[in-house]
């Protein structure tokens, strides 16, 4: 049987400070939520092993600072990304209005080989706040924006409750995998000398 190699896929999460980027990443990777997160300084990342159709790969998720003073660091962190996630708070109109700025900044600094077809995914977060009564950005408005940018996949999430987080990241992983060029980057795999099977962490998604 052919050996299974683990491929590295890089995902960047962008959005205004306070929209829940760190919370979403930690909910997906660690199944944890905290109200005590401090603003990300520069950038940080977590990894998660995922599997699609008998292929193992490591999803490297970069959580970047939303403050303007850190945006100059973008070039170093954005380049080599396989998918970009744009996050806004459904209760803060300005965070939604800034999505276009984040998208344009990524395309300028990351310089993808095919910018018109580079995969983005949009997450409208914090739908749990005040039972939805504080919401100012409608799902219809968000979907219309996504459609105008080439039908970007859209998910509404609650990092606090874990709602839709797995489905969103499965779609993100699938888009990242589909964008991976021919010259794939592989991580060294371990040899199972005992002949046992490898644990499967996650299943494929439909997106």
UniProtKB/Swiss-Prot annotation:
Source organism of the structure: Prunus armeniaca (Apricot)
Name of the protein this chain belongs to: Ras-related protein Rab7
Subcellular location: Cell membrane
Biological role: Protein transport. Probably involved in vesicular traffic.
PROSITE patterns xrefs: RAB (PS51419)
Membrane topology value: Lipid-anchor
The keyword Magnesium appears for this protein: no
Single GO cellular component term: plasma membrane
UniProt-annotated binding residues for GTP: 15-22, 63-67, 125-128
Modified residue annotations for Cysteine methyl ester: 207
């Amino acid at each position: 049987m052919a050996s299974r190699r683990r491929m590295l896929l890089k995902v960047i999460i962008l959005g205004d400070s306070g929209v829940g980027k760190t919370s979403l990443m930690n909910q997906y990777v660690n199944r944890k939520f905290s109200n005590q997160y401090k603003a990300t300084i520069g950038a940080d990342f977590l990894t998660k092993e995922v599997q699609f159709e008998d292929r193992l790969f490591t999803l490297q998720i970069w959580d970047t600072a939303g403050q303007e003073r850190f945006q100059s660091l973008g070039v170093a962190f954005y380049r080599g990304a396989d998918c970009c996630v744009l996050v806004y708070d459904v209760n803060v109109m300005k965070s939604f209005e800034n999505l276009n700025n984040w998208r344009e900044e990524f395309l300028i600094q990351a310089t993808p080989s095919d910018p018109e077809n580079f995969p983005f995914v949009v997450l409208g977060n914090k739908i749990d706040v005040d039972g939805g009564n504080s919401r100012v950005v409608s799902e219809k408005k968000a979907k219309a924006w996504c459609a105008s940018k080439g039908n970007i996949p859209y998910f509404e999430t609650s990092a606090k409750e874990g709602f839709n987080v797995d489905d969103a990241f499965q779609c993100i992983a699938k888009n990242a995998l589909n964008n991976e060029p021919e010259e794939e980057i592989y991580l060294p795999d371990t040899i199972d000398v005992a002949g046992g099977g490898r644990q499967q962490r996650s299943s494929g998604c439909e997106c």
